[in-house]
Regions:
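Sec/Tat signal peptide C-region and signal peptidase I cleavage site
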Residues: 34-38
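Bacterial N-terminal signal peptides
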Residues: 20-31
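N-terminal leader/targeting pre-sequences
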Residues: 39-231
Length: 231
């Protein structure tokens, strides 16, 4: 092989290397972009409201994307009772008290809700509570399946579907500075299961049980289970 040929080969190698680097960089950027837009998923236990112990065999799955959130809840409850799913959303969880978002960020006294709402913390955490878009009647075995969803900036339409939010959105508790979901990837989402009592035979009353806060209680409504999803 002549020196001219060897020099020619030496000159061409950097060009191939640069092309390879460009392709590799493009691949890395594409992968990073796809990872950034990919949905985040997590699965947590469902806890009993009274005992704070896990409900046997129950779970809640949350999927986050830039567009909003979707949830799947599988649990056991009282057979024949109507239930609705609610989201308690902390859009600024870094401002939650004691480093964890909970009742003390909503109520003045978590052990006595009649003491009133903690308006400063609701504002600081940019908290909101809305219907999760799901309701169902537990089957004869007590099994309950709920699949909810909420988009960014979405305000649930219908009576009794917005609990904590802005006064302009006609929230039942008009103390919020925001309504619904602002940051689906960064918010703390607490799914709450409300029991409305025995399912009504009247379709209109049943619809209220499945879609509105404390709707058509038969005879009472109570929060029985919850699941905490931390980003």
């Amino acid at each position: 092989m002549t020196m001219r040929a060897q020099l020619g080969q030496i000159k061409r190698r950097p060009m191939r290397t640069r092309a390879g680097v460009v392709i590799l960089a493009a691949t890395v950027l594409l992968a990073a972009s796809q990872a950034a837009s990919a949905a985040q998923k997590d699965r947590v236990r469902v806890l009993d409201q009274a005992s704070r112990e896990p409900v046997r065999g129950a779970f809640s799955m949350l999927e986050r994307s830039d567009r909003g959130i979707e949830t799947r809840l599988r649990t056991r409850a009282r057979p024949g009772h109507a239930h609705s799913l609610w989201y308690v959303i902390f859009n600024s969880p870094e401002n939650c008290s004691d480093g964890a978002c909970g009742d003390d960020d909503i109520f003045i006294d978590p052990s006595d809700h009649s003491a009133g709402f903690n308006a400063p913390q609701i504002a600081a955490t940019r908290a909101s509570s809305v219907w999760g878009g799901a309701g169902a009647v537990a089957n004869p075995a007590g099994r309950l399946k709920l699949e909810g969803a909420l988009g960014v900036g979405e305000v649930p339409d219908g009576p009794g579907r917005l609990v904590i939010g802005r006064a302009a959105d006609r929230a039942l508790v008009p103390l919020g500075v925001v309504t619904g979901l602002e940051d689906p990837r960064g918010a703390v989402i607490i799914g709450v299961l409300q029991d409305h009592g025995a399912a009504h035979a009247d379709p209109e009353l049943l619809e209220r049980q499945l879609t509105s806060f404390q709707g058509a209680c038969n005879p009472v409504c109570e929060e029985i289970q919850f699941a905490v999803h931390v980003p």
